[in-house]
């Protein structure tokens, strides 16, 4: 049976008015009087609902339909009629309604506002609410926009491994992958676990980043990007941290930090524009019900040239600020969210790239600057959030990279293949990482990362 999507009715109304159509979806609300009733139907194709009018004289099963519970799945036949004086532009006058699957009266999503905290406990049902219908449709659009941006520019999409033997960040906050008996693992003479008896004959973890593997492909294809899940065993129970999240990580060869920042700015503006143009109903909803400054903020971003400031200059600005910070401002300390927001919201009033951070607070693979104290790193800070993108020019000089790895106590043998890139045709190259969920939070105004990923994995929580 061919059904018409509600999205098609809204986008091409004139093609359907006065015609008999069939729609299928789920009941959001139902109300009735003695001889007629109204159903708000959502079919998943569009943010807005379709109103269905049903009358006793037309439906043999009128009483059964009038008693439908919210959440029931139905198929409705009828004529689409314009309603210029009403809230909705049109409605379906039903001639037949079939119950595909009834919902029980204890359906958790009744017609009232539910807190986001409560909806997290029923994450399998929350996509049926207005807010999460909008969030996850925008998530889908943004994922497509990211691929579209890079594909239009000739980038090669690389699938990097989920299971890895290396730590891209050198931070050690990784989830171990093992088939060993955790109650009685084999041990070496010194008492440590003998991972040579494990599935991969070595210690392995879930990836924290696809960057290192991505770099290998940029040395062959020049411009590449990865887009996949990453995992951090970081015990941070905050609104901005999750143990499982998605990262967008491009790598560009024959490129320096300036090229990297230009790419990051172009990409962020592109995906915001794409969302504004292709999800107007959802974005209007977010602006009305989540953050009433959202559209102004996003339009300001796409129309502004991003500011640039070095880390040292940023520290100087912050140390002279008339605002008291919870975390001390000191050269050598990483910037905290309060510092980042002060720079973007009070000083520059737009997105800002902070560059040239102290080497001691950045990863081993970042290119050492001539001052031997800072590295060619950049963070993109945006108003309302703080850091949204982090990137750097990579260290292409073998001796510099080896020295840095020794300083940090990293095992050369674990990164032999990464060091090979510096032996065989090394070139300047750069890249960055965009936390996909943080981008969604920024573009929708949602304030908690748990509300922009379908089934969040956080400290003490792996339900569903």
Swiss-Prot record:
Q: Which GO terms describe its molecular function?
A: asparagine-tRNA ligase activity; ATP binding; catalytic activity, acting on a protein; nucleic acid binding; transferase activity
InterPro entries found in the cross-reference section:
Aa-tRNA-synt_II, aa-tRNA-synth_II, aa-tRNA-synth_II/BPL/LPL, Asn-tRNA-ligase, Asp/Asn-tRNA-synth_IIb, NA-bd_OB-fold, NA-bd_OB_tRNA
Quaternary form? Homodimer.
Q: Which domain of life is it from?
A: Bacteria
Q: List the disulfide bonds.
A: none
Q: Name one Pfam family in it.
A: tRNA_anti-codon
Q: Quote the protein name from its UniProt record.
A: Asparagine--tRNA ligase
Question: Which GO BP terms, alphabetically?
Answer: asparaginyl-tRNA aminoacylation
Tell me the keywords, alphabetical order.
Aminoacyl-tRNA synthetase, ATP-binding, Cytoplasm, Ligase, Nucleotide-binding, Protein biosynthesis
- The broad enzyme category this protein falls into is ligase
Give the GO cellular component terms, alphabetically: cytoplasm
Which reaction(s) does its UniProt entry say it catalyses? tRNA(Asn) + L-asparagine + ATP = L-asparaginyl-tRNA(Asn) + AMP + diphosphate + H(+)
Q: Where in the cell is it found?
A: Cytoplasm
According to its UniProt record, the EC number is 6.1.1.22
Keyword Nucleotide-binding assigned to the entry: answer is: yes
Q: Would I find Cytoplasm among this entry's keywords?
A: yes
Per the record, the similarity remark reads:
Belongs to the class-II aminoacyl-tRNA synthetase family.
